């Protein structure tokens, strides 16, 4: 009897756990969908190639990669970069960077400042959406920044855009980037000034030492000669 007590206890505990889990899951309320956020993707400017990777589960779903221009006063939606379904794959060329797309990522090549914008991936099956800020500076930095309260997966698989919030978020990101760049430039300038001051102090001390040596030689050359009683020079 003692041999079967432990397995029987495990069965009872497991059954109670499953029953409790099912009851709690059936009564759980689906949380309200919040704006999607994405961790920062940092990259350097050397090769001008960026890959935007989605966290959405878009396998075997129809997806659309889209770009929003943020150089104009308001965000302007451009034609879809890439549409992928089970039946076909369609890409467009907008005169910007060359690109390659899949259901999970979008790789952009030979980026320029004109390619700055918001790149958005929408899952046509679930309606989920994920957006990337891609801020490109000619020489200083090239980064894909996290999204703010801009794009929502709305009802009917439609992307809902809060234009005012999006504008504020983009302006905030740009200010943050420029402030970071300004601090970096200020730090570099401060280091250059510090190093320059050290070099000037070193050269000045070296020059003062040379002048002291020259004065000493001059004093020795101009010191008067004295005759002793024996006729020796002093």
Swiss-Prot record:
Lipid bilayer topology: Single-pass type I membrane protein
Domain Ig-like V-type residue range list: 24-122
Primary localization: membrane
Signal peptide: 1-23
Superkingdom to which the source organism belongs: Viruses
Key word Secreted present: no
Keyword annotations from UniProtKB, A to Z: Glycoprotein, Immunoglobulin domain, Membrane, Signal, Transmembrane, Transmembrane helix
Record: glycosylation sites: 57, 105, 110
Transmembrane segments: 183-203
Subcellular location: Membrane
Cytoplasmic side: 204-234
Gene Ontology CC annotation, any one: membrane
Extracellular membrane side: 24-182
Similarity comment: Belongs to the RL11 family.
Protein name according to UniProt: Viral Fc-gamma receptor-like protein IR11
Organism, as annotated: Human cytomegalovirus (strain AD169)
Phylogenetic placement of the source organism: Viruses, Duplodnaviria, Heunggongvirae, Peploviricota, Herviviricetes
């Amino acid at each position: 009897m003692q041999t079967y007590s432990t397995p029987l206890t495990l069965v009872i505990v497991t059954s109670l756990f499953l029953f409790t889990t099912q009851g709690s899951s059936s009564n759980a309320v689906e949380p309200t969908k919040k704006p999607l956020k994405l961790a920062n993707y940092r990259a350097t400017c050397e090769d001008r190639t960026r890959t935007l990777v989605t966290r959405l589960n878009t396998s075997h779903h129809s997806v659309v990669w889209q770009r929003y221009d943020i150089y104009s006063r308001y965000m302007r939606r451009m034609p879809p970069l890439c549409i992928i379904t089970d039946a076909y794959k369609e890409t467009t060329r907008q005169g910007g960077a060359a690109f390659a797309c899949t259901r999970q990522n979008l790789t952009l090549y030979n980026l320029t400042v004109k390619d700055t914008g918001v790149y958005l991936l929408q899952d046509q099956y679930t309606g989920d959406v994920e957006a990337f800020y891609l801020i490109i500076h000619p020489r200083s930095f090239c980064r894909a920044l996290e999204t703010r309260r801009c794009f929502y997966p709305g009802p009917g698989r439609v992307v809902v855009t809060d234009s005012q919030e999006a504008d504020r978020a983009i302006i905030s990101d740009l200010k943050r980037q420029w402030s970071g760049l300004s601090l970096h430039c200020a730090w570099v300038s401060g280091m250059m000034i510090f190093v320059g001051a050290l070099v000037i102090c070193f050269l000045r001390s070296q020059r003062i030492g040379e002048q002291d040596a020259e004065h000493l030689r001059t004093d020795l050359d101009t010191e008067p000669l004295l005759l002793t009683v024996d006729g020796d020079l002093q």
